[in-house]
A protein has these predicted regions:
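Extended beta-strand/beta-hairpin segments
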Residues: 1-52, 60-150
Length: 150
């Protein structure tokens, strides 16, 4: 089994926490906060961190899949958004996440793009784990906005 992924949160003040990523010396300490009125919004909140983790994992997985087929240096921009709603008890929950990955090149320039697109989501540990509880919709577009997946 692989090593566990560990982070440590240290309370600073109000609703702010410093997040230490441990054995990664290049990783800066991240300051989190919650949105007003409880916090000041001085850092990303938990929902933003969840969405960032899903988006980062998907983008990295797509890059990995593209590189498997000898596509190097494929620029991309990933945007993700969480939909929030209240459950039966009135508690706010993440109801869904939408992710759009826009490649910075034309689809026609990429080797075996169909194969890369067919498999990249399966490599994404975070997205597949989150999907057990939250729907995640993923779209990939090329540089002119042509939808490659739906």
């Amino acid at each position: 089994m692989d090593e566990p992924s560990t982070v440590t949160l240290v309370w600073r003040e109000a609703y702010r926490f410093a997040v230490d990523f441990g054995q990664q010396p290049a990783a800066a300490t991240l300051l989190t906060d919650v949105k007003p009125p409880l916090g000041t919004g001085a850092g990303p909140d938990s929902e933003q961190l969840l969405v960032a983790a899903v988006a980062n994992c998907l983008a990295s997985s797509l890059l990995f899949s593209l590189r498997k087929f000898r596509n190097e240096a494929v620029p991309m921009r990933t945007t993700a958004e969480a939909a929030l709603s209240r459950n039966a008890q009135g508690r706010l929950r993440v109801a869904g996440i939408e992710v759009a990955i826009r490649l910075g090149v034309a689809a026609s320039t990429l080797r075996q793009l169909d194969r890369a697109l067919a498999q990249f989501e399966d490599f994404c540990v975070v997205t597949q784990s989150v999907r057990a509880a939250v729907p995640v919709a993923v779209r990939v577009l090329d540089d002119d906005g042509t939808l490659l997946t739906a």
